[in-house]
Regions:
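Class I S-adenosyl-L-methionine-dependent methyltransferase catalytic core
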Residues: 1-314
C-alpha cells in the first residue's frame, strides 16, 4: 500500500487518471452520438485505436515485483507502476451498445498486459471485431496511417460501399511516440487524443544549468532540431560584473507550459484544428504532469473536445 501511495504522489495514477478517463469517455459518447446519426447515410465504418491499451488494472501485480524500467536515467519504475497508469479500453467498450465502433484495435508492447486486457474484455460482446496486438505502438500507428491512406484512395471509386473513420487514443507511459510517427497521421480521416508527459518526464530533461539531457530523444519527441528546442527553454542574458561582460543562460520559469505549447504548435502543423487549451492534469502536489490534447481535421470535433476540457478543468 505504501508503494501505491508513493506512486500517486509521483503522478503514476490517482485522481489525474480519473480526470483523463472521464474527459475521454465524455468525448467518446459525443463522438458516437454524432457519428451514429450519419453512419448509415454516409456509409461510415468506425475504428477505435488505442496505442497503449494496457490492462486497466489498478490491483497489485505480484508477478511484476522487482521488474523495473529506467526512464532516461531519471529513476526506475516498476511494471506495477505502469499498471496504475490506467487505460481507457474498458470504458470505451462499455459504450458499444450505443452502438459503438465497428472495429477495436488494442495495442500494447507488453504481452502480459494484452493477455489480461483480453480476459477483462471477454465479458463484452465485441468478439471478432476486436484485435489485440502485442506490438510497438509506433509500428502499429504507421500501419493504421497506411490503411487510412489507402482507404482515402478507395473512397474515390464509385463501387466502394463504405469508408472508415478512426478515433485514436495515444496515452504513452513517457516519451514513447516519435514525432515522425505522428506525422503519418496527417491528412487522415481521424480524430487524435494524445497525452503529453509535460511535467512527469519531459521537464526532467530540460535542466536548470542550460543543458538538454538526452537531446536526441527530445528531437524525436518534438520533431524539432536541438537548437530550436534549446532556444524555447533558455534565455540568454548579458551580465556585467567585476569581471566584465559575459553571457548567462537561464531556464524559462514556465517550462512545463512551454512543453505543452510546443507540442500543440507542432500538432497544428499537421492538423487544422487543435485544442488551444489542453486538459492539464496535476499530481497531488498540484504540479502539472500531463497535458491531454485533441487534434482533428474536423472543427466540430475539436470544439466539442474543448468544451469538455473546459468543463473538466473548471
Amino acid at each position: 500500500m505504501a508503494n501505491s501511495n508513493k506512486n500517486q504522489e509521483n503522478g503514476w495514477g490517482g485522481l489525474w487518471t480519473e480526470q483523463k478517463l472521464d474527459c475521454f469517455e465524455n468525448y467518446v459518447k459525443a463522438y458516437l452520438t454524432i457519428m451514429n446519426a450519419y453512419r448509415e447515410k454516409y456509409h461510415w465504418k468506425l475504428i477505435y485505436f488505442d496505442g497503449f491499451a494496457g490492462c486497466g488494472d489498478r490491483a497489485k501485480q505480484k508477478e511484476a515485483e522487482g521488474k523495473t524500467i529506467d526512464i532516461f536515467g531519471q529513476g526506475s519504475v516498476t511494471k506495477e507502476d505502469m499498471h496504475l497508469y490506467e487505460g481507457a479500453a474498458e470504458r470505451v467498450v462499455k459504450l458499444d451498445k450505443m452502438p459503438g465502433f465497428n472495429y477495436y484495435y488494442f495495442v500494447d508492447k507488453y504481452e502480459d498486459n494484452i493477455t489480461r486486457l483480453q480476459l477483462k474484455l471477454a465479458q463484452y460482446d465485441i468478439g471478432k471485431r476486436t484485435k489485440y496486438l502485442h506490438s510497438d505502438a509506433n509500428y502499429e500507428i504507421c500501419r493504421l496511417a497506411k490503411f487510412m491512406k489507402e482507404d482515402a484512395v478507395r473512397r474515390t471509386t464509385p463501387d466502394k460501399p463504405f469508408h472508415y473513420k478512426t478515433l485514436c487514443l495515444l496515452d504513452p507511459f513517457g516519451m514513447s511516440i516519435d514525432w515522425d510517427t505522428i506525422v503519418t497521421l496527417a491528412g487522415k480521416s481521424l480524430d487524435l487524443w494524445i497525452l503529453v508527459p509535460t511535467g512527469s518526464i519531459v521537464s526532467r530533461l530540460i535542466q536548470n544549468d542550460g543543458t538538454l539531457r538526452y537531446p536526441e530523444t527530445l528531437e524525436r519527441f518534438f520533431g524539432l532540431p536541438q537548437k530550436e528546442i534549446h532556444e524555447r527553454f533558455y534565455i540568454k542574458d548579458q551580465v556585467h560584473d567585476l569581471f566584465g561582460e559575459h553571457e548567462e543562460i537561464r531556464k524559462v520559469k514556465n517550462s512545463i507550459e512551454v512543453i505543452s505549447e510546443i507540442y500543440c504548435e507542432q500538432l497544428g502543423t499537421l492538423f487544422p484544428y487543435v485544442t488551444n487549451k489542453p486538459l492539464v492534469l496535476k499530481n497531488s502536489n498540484n504540479v502539472p504532469i500531463f497535458s491531454f490534447v485533441c487534434a482533428s481535421y474536423n472543427q466540430t470535433a475539436v470544439k466539442i473536445a474543448q468544451q469538455i476540457i473546459t468543463k473538466r478543468q473548471n
